Amino acid sequence: ELVNQKLANDISEEEINAYYEKNKELFRLDNPLVKGLFIKVPLSSPDLGNVRVWYRKNNQDVIEKLEKYSLRNAVSYDYFYDRWTSVPDVAAKIPLKVLDTDANYLDKNRNVEVKDTAFCYFLHIEDFLDKDKQKPLDFARDEIKEILINLKRVEFINKVKEDLYQRASDRNKIIYYYLNSDE
């Protein structure tokens, strides 16, 4: 564990970027990714008409209005314009069965409004990356860091083995056993 912590701290952003650039073809999406905004409000909330207009727009004034509104009224609010989120993670928040079977639904329908008996769900998709496309660096960063840690761990273990062997050899502490081939 101590080795892992030391190695994790030794991984630089430059190493991550270099590994990503050199091995882009290894990083493919298993699920589509989206950037956008999600808000879930009770059906009894005031000003739902405004929310219907606001959630479709991506500008600072409207986002501020939505954030203030969500503090007072929303059960759930997620602003993810600045980070990629997997479609299954988004689908878990909204009762829309088509997302279970058609992952590209959100590429074709960038504004989604769904109601159930208690809530109204609003989802705006600003950006969409399809399955099997290259993972964005931000989304692949943790995976790359783990790969680099594992590579350094193997390198460290091999160096320790080599050092131990060399020290034992220098001190004549190595005993060789030969099998008798006559038996």
Name each region found by the language model.
Residues E1-E183:
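Peptidyl-prolyl cis-trans isomerase
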